[in-house]
Amino acid sequence: MMEEERFKAEIFHVTQEVCNRTASELTESESRNVIVDELFCVGVTEMVWEQIRVLAKDIEAFAEHAGRKTVQPQDVLLCCRRNEGLYEIINNFHKESIKSKKKKKENSTT
């Protein structure tokens, strides 16, 4: 349980930073005083946490359906297939990761 609490605390911290930054930007651009309530950040954190849990279960189910016990990048890509922007970001990250590993392997053998 300690690890879960640590992850949730980190999500809360990032959520609070994003909300406060956005509030500051709105305050500057619209000349309105925008204040972020801490309970709002708690609510957003809970939504994000629950979404992470659902996503993890879906990714594990895709791997299991493919007859694997280990999650592969294609499971993650399959899970985000309906969000074109996210799919592109993750796919590009995966391709760059493969290229980087190949370069390291080539450099270590020469």
Curated annotation (Swiss-Prot):
Family matches, as InterPro entries: CENP-S/Mhf1, Histone-fold
The organism's place on the tree of life at top rank: Eukaryota
Major location category of this protein: nucleus
Keyword Transmembrane applies: no
GO biological process, one term: replication fork processing
GO molecular function, one term: protein heterodimerization activity
Protein localization: Nucleus
Quaternary data: The MHF histone-fold complex is a heterotetramer of 2 mhf1-mhf2 heterodimers. Component of the inner kinetochore constitutive centromere-associated network (CCAN) (also known as central kinetochore Sim4 complex in fission yeast), which is composed of at least cnl2, cnp3, cnp20, fta1, fta2, fta3, fta4, fta6, fta7, mal2, mhf1, mhf2, mis6, mis15, mis17, sim4 and wip1.
Cited function: Component of a FANCM-MHF complex that promotes gene conversion at blocked replication forks, probably by reversal of the stalled fork. FANCM-MHF promotes non-crossover recombination.
Recorded family membership: Belongs to the TAF9 family. CENP-S/MHF1 subfamily.
Name used for this protein in its record: Inner kinetochore subunit mhf1
